[in-house]
């Protein structure tokens, strides 16, 4: 939930570090800091509560010289948000500086042991305990930093990604990871090295990266080949990978916020997601087909699986609920959808014949990563659906499909959700047809319909000005209720989540029929009720639910299929979406809800891209 940036090389470190932190702002944070070994071999540390821009302003008249440094954006886990608790932390000796992402679970025990040895602490963080522990071994072993890091990490219990540097050697930096992501970028001729929580701060400098694995330590020296060892000092082999990441996609592209850009990106993102996978022949629809290498490579395991478990968190979990309905309908397989955080501790029943589908935008979600490791131990096939290429989940899975929607910077997920649903649709269609539970006619028709979704999505986006006007009518609200049935129930959950994430308005999503089992007690003229009331097999039933709300003076905003006249006679306001197959409705019905949440939050003057208390990538439990 924090961002780490490190640099060592030929250039001035400070600009590299600050720009790197700005690239990581999307992850969420409450404070920022930087440490540099200056040209006079002095260790300079600057930290502040608030934005990276505050840190940049603070350091403007300070000594920011040097060719080595580490920097950090922090989300508070141990200790309140403050300059004192911000990273980097410096050892009591003043010789070491460290940044850390993760949680050291036994930090209190270690802190007491260090206090008995005379160490004192300036903060209430677990990170300061870790740097003092490294310093303890550093002073004992003749100031060998790598050995000290190995010894300290053998004592520590928990998750960590760390980068540490020593004042006496400005040509040396050490990084390590355990259950928290860390990437090393390798510059030309090993003259520059970059360290970061993900590749986004690195790619403008080099596209050559090494993804550290759990238990690995990177021993980095300028001008020498990267050396990676484990905690027992044994050498580890590694592969330098080439990252294909378009820098232009990391900008707002003329939009006011990343979130709005990413909402508008969705038609093109879905085209990218389906490119090379969805093969459409409009003249000969019988030739329509889907190409998924994961299905080709693991056909028998997927076809023969009787039980599929989808594990995910947040928005990805909502996508999983849609995936459940798609796979059960098209493949006639039993599908369970579990919160990864609950699944990993529930002693789940997993058989070797099962398939576990892990969904994560970042590919670094700690609970999802732990869940698939558990399932892997029990012999299940692990199928990943992730966005970030080369991420931890992508590397841990047996097979899978990248959603290929490009970097998602806004904390509130939009294009990743529709990308995940698209991939789940491709999987359900391809697997259902492969095993004979989906006939040729339906298969070919659905493929053509799916290929038209990007164009239909553009028609929804054309209504943004009208949705913006509607949003202005709802900023007064303190509570929202989102209701849908069938495929639109997960959309109701996602719409409610988007609103509460960025507007801080309490919102709940329910199956519309469950309204009578409690939520209807809340209905009055002050509570907006959002119905996703598109044409599908439960249309008449949701009309009945709407009439119940109307009779109690509830204010109804309805998402409807274009041309619908019945809902218009009941709802106070409506937003139309184009007609499509029932199974594809979520890809369209979610878009107006994304826009509604966005415009409500903007009208309230809130920070849409970095809402309070939220992190883009949840890399700790």
Can you annotate each of these PLM segments?
Residues 182-188, 192-209, 315, 341-375, ...:
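Glycine-rich, anion-gripping cofactor-binding loops and their flanking helix/strand elements
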Residues 1-252, 256, 261, 268-307, ...:
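Conserved short alpha-helical segments that host acidic/polar catalytic motifs at enzyme active sites
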Residues 50, 67, 71-84, 281-299, ...:
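Glycine-rich oxoanion-binding loops at beta->alpha junctions
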Residues 4, 98, 164, 175, ...:
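Structural beta-sheet core signal
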Residues 154, 266-270, 274-309, 399-528, ...:
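Active-site phosphate/pyrophosphate-binding segments
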Residues 259, 555, 568-570, 580-621:
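Generic C-terminus detector
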Residues 303-445, 449-452, 534-573, 596:
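Glycine-rich phosphate-binding loops that contact phosphosugars or nucleotide phosphates
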């Amino acid at each position: 939930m924090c961002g780490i940036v490190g640099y060592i090389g030929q250039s001035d470190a400070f600009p590299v570090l600050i720009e790197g932190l700005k690239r990581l702002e999307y992850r969420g944070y409450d404070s920022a800091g930087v440490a540099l070994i200056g040209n006079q071999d002095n260790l300079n540390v600057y930290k502040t509560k608030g934005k990276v821009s505050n840190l940049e302003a603070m350091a403007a008249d300070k000594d920011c010289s040097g060719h080595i440094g580490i920097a950090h954006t922090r989300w508070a886990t141990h200790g309140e948000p403050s300059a004192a608790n911000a990273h980097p932390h410096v050892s009591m000796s003043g010789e070491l500086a460290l940044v850390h992402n993760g949680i050291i679970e036994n930090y209190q025990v270690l802190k007491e042991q260090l206090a008995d040895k005379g160490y004192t602490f300036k903060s209430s963080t677990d990170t300061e305990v870790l740097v003092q522990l490294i310093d303890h071994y550093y002073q004992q072993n003749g100031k060998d930093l790598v050995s000290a890091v190995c010894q300290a990490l053998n004592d520590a219990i928990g998750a960590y990604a760390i980068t540490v540097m020593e004042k006496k050697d400005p040509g040396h930096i050490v990084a390590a990871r355990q259950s928290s992501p860390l990437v090393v970028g390798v510059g030309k001729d090993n003259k520059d090295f970059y360290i970061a929580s993900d590749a986004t701060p690195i790619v403008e400098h080099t596209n050559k990266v090494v993804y550290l694995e759990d238990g690995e330590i990177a021993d980095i020296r300028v001008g020498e080949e990267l050396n990676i060892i484990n905690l027992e000092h044994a050498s580890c082999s590694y592969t330098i990978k080439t990252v294909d990441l378009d820098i232009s996609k990391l900008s707002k592209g003329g939009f006011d916020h990343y979130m709005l850009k990413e909402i508008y990106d969705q038609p093109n993102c879905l085209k990218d997601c389906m490119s090379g996978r969805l093969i459409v022949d409009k003249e000969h629809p019988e030739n329509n087909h889907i190409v998924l290498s994961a299905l080709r490579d693991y056909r028998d395991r997927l076809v023969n699986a009787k039980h599929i478990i989808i594990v995910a968190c947040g928005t990805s979990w909502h996508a999983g609920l849609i995936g459940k309905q798609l796979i059960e309908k098209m493949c006639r397989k039993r599908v369970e959808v579990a919160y990864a955080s609950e699944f990993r501790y529930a002693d789940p029943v997993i058989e070797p014949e099962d398939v576990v589908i892990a969904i994560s935008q970042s590919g670094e979600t700690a609970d999802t990563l732990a869940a698939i490791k558990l399932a892997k131990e029990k012999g299940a096939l692990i199928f990943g659906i992730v966005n970030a290429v080369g991420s931890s989940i992508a590397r841990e899975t047996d097979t899978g499909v990248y959603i290929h929607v490009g970097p998602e910077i806004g904390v509130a997920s939009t294009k990743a959700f529709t990308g995940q649903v698209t991939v789940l649709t491709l999987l359900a269609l391809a697997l259902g047809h492969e095993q004979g539970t989906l006939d040729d006619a339906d298969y070919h028709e659905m493929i053509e319909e799916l290929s038209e979704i990007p164009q239909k999505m553009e028609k929804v986006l054309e209504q943004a000005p009208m949705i913006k006007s509607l949003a202005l009518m709802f900023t007064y609200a303190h509570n929202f209720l989102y209701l849908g049935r069938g495929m639109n129930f997960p959309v109701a959950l996602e719409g409610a989540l988007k609103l509460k994430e960025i507007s801080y308005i309490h919102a709940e999503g329910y199956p519309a029929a469950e309204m009578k089992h409690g939520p209807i007690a809340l209905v009055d003229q002050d509570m907006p009720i959002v119905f996703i009331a598109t044409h599908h097999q439960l249309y008449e039933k949701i009309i009945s639910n709407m009439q119940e709300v109307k009779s109690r003076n509830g204010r109804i905003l309805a998402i409807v299929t274009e041309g619908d006249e019945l809902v218009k006679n009941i709802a106070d306001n409506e937003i139309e979406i184009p007609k499509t197959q029932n199974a594809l409705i979520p890809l369209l019905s979610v878009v107006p809800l994304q826009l509604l949440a966005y415009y409500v939050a903007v009208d309230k003057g809130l920070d849409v891209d970095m809402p309070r208390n939220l992190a883009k990538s949840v890399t700790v439990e």
